[in-house]
Curated annotation (Swiss-Prot):
Mg(2+) 1 binds at D297, E311. InterPro entries: ATP-grasp, ATP_grasp_subdomain_1, D-Ala_lig_Van_CS, D_ala_D_ala, Dala_Dala_lig_C, Dala_Dala_lig_N, PreATP-grasp_dom_sf. Pathway: Cell wall biogenesis; peptidoglycan biosynthesis. This is D-alanine--D-alanine ligase. Binds 2 magnesium or manganese ions per subunit. ATP binds at residues 171-226. Its cofactor is Mg(2+); Mn(2+). Residues 136-344 form the ATP-grasp domain. Its main location: cytoplasm. Cell wall formation. Belongs to the D-alanine--D-alanine ligase family. One of its GO terms (cellular component) is cytosol. The keyword Ligase applies.
Length: 348
C-alpha cells in the first residue's frame, strides 16, 4: 500500500473506438481525485490500456493523461495482465472506459475476479446496457415506453428473403426516416439516419462494419432529454437536462464539439413531465440491473406528451461537455463530491 488511504485505480483507454473520449473522462476523474478533500481521502493511480489491449504502469499512464508519452519508452511500461489481479495497492477500481471491453461487462468480470470493489454496474447490468437489442428486449418485458424497432445480424444482410421481411417491417411499423445503429457502440459511432430504402441499405452496411448485431429504430421528432442516476441500494435521479444540436441529429461530432451542440440544465419542462422522466430513469436502471452511475436518455414529444426511453448508458462520459457530471452539479452535487460518492457506493 502507498498509504493508509484507499488507492483508487482509474482505468482508461482501451481497444474501443471511443478510446480518446475515455482518456478525456479519465483526466477529469483523476483531477477530481487529486483535488482538495479527495486528495486527503484517496490516492489516485491511473492505469492506461492502449489500443492494442496492453496495460501500462502508473508512470506511463499518467503521462498519457497529460500528453507526455513521447518522453517514455512504450514497451517498457507494459504490465503483465496475469499479475493484475494481485495488484494489492488497488483498493477500488474506477473504470473510465467506453464502448466494447469497457462498459459491456468484460472488464467488470475481470474486476470481480480480483475481489476488489469497482465503480458502476456489475457484469449483467453492463452487458445489458451495452447491447441495445438486449436492453430494449428487457424494457419491453417491463412495459417501459420506447420507440418501435427491429433488429438483425450482419449475416442476415446476404439473406434476400430475410431482408425482404425487414423491409416490410420498416414500411409497416417504423417508416422513414429511421436510425440504423450498431448494437454495441456508444457516442453515435457507426450510426446513420436513412430517408429511403437506398440509404437504409447503405446504413446497414456501414453499421455492420462496427458490429455483428444491428438495430433499426423509428426516428422521433421531439426533444432529446437526459437524466442522471446515482446509487445502488437507494437510487436517486438528477435534474433533467436537454440537448440541442445544430446537426440533423446528435452525431459524434456534435457530441464532442461545443460549437455544434448545447445543453439546457435544467430543461424547460413542467414539473409533472420532469418527475415522470426522473422516475422512469430509475425504473430503466432497475430493469437492466444497472447501478452506481448511469445516464438515461429520452425522447419527448410535446404534441402528445409521450416520453420514450432511448437507452441507459452505464458508464457515461466525464469530459468537459459530458452531461452526467453537469446534471449532478445542477442538482447540487459538485464533481469532487460526485466522484467520492461513486467510490463509496462501490464499497457498499
Amino acid at each position: 500500500m502507498f498509504s493508509n488511504k484507499p488507492v483508487i485505480g482509474v482505468v482508461f483507454g482501451g481497444k474501443s473506438s471511443e478510446h480518446e473520449v475515455s482518456i478525456k473522462s479519465a483526466k477529469t476523474i483523476y483531477n477530481a481525485l487529486s483535488h482538495l478533500s479527495n486528495k486527503e481521502r484517496y490516492v489516485a493511480r491511473p492505469v492506461y490500456i492502449d489500443k492494442y489491449g496492453y496495460w501500462h504502469d502508473y508512470i506511463f499512464s499518467e503521462s498519457i493523461l497529460y500528453d507526455k508519452k513521447d518522453h517514455l519508452i512504450f514497451e517498457d511500461r507494459r504490465v503483465n495482465l496475469t499479475n493484475l489481479s494481485n495488484m494489492e495497492d488497488i483498493d477500488v477500481w474506477f473504470p473510465c472506459l467506453h464502448g466494447p471491453n469497457g462498459e459491456d461487462g468484460v472488464i467488470q468480470g475481470l474486476f470481480k475476479s480480483t475481489g476488489k470493489p469497482f465503480v458502476g454496474s456489475g457484469v449483467l447490468g453492463s452487458a445489458l446496457g451495452m447491447d441495445k437489442i438486449a436492453m430494449k428486449s428487457v424494457f419491453k418485458s417491463y412495459n417501459l415506453p420506447q420507440v418501435p424497432y427491429v433488429s438483425l445480424n450482419k449475416a442476415d444482410i446476404q439473406n434476400n428473403l430475410y431482408m425482404k421481411s425487414i423491409y416490410e417491417q420498416i414500411n409497416k411499423i417504423i417508416n422513414y426516416p429511421c436510425f440504423i445503429k450498431p448494437a454495441n457502440l456508444g457516442s453515435s459511432v457507426g450510426i446513420t439516419k436513412a430517408y429511403s430504402k437506398e440509404e437504409f441499405i447503405t446504413g446497414i452496411e456501414f453499421a455492420a462494419k462496427y458490429d455483428e448485431r444491428i438495430i433499426v429504430e423509428k426516428s422521433i421528432e421531439g426533444r432529446e432529454l437526459e437524466c442522471g442516476v446515482l446509487g445502488k441500494s437507494i437510487m436517486k435521479s438528477s435534474v433533467v437536462g436537454e440537448v440541442k444540436f445544430q446537426t440533423d441529429w446528435y452525431t459524434y461530432e456534435s457530441k464532442y464539439n461545443a460549437n455544434l451542440s448545447s445543453t439546457i440544465i435544467p430543461a424547460d419542462l413542467n414539473i409533472e413531465i420532469s418527475n415522470k422522466i426522473q422516475k422512469l430513469a430509475i425504473e430503466a436502471c432497475k430493469a437492466i440491473n444497472a447501478y452506481g452511475l448511469a445516464r438515461v436518455d429520452f425522447f419527448y414529444q410535446e404534441s402528445t406528451q409521450q416520453i420514450y426511453i432511448n437507452e441507459v448508458n452505464t458508464l457515461p462520459g466525464f469530459t468537459k461537455t459530458s452531461m452526467y457530471p453537469t446534471l449532478w452539479e445542477a442538482s447540487g452535487l459538485k464533481l469532487e463530491k460526485l466522484v467520492a460518492s461513486l467510490i463509496e457506493i462501490a464499497k457498499e
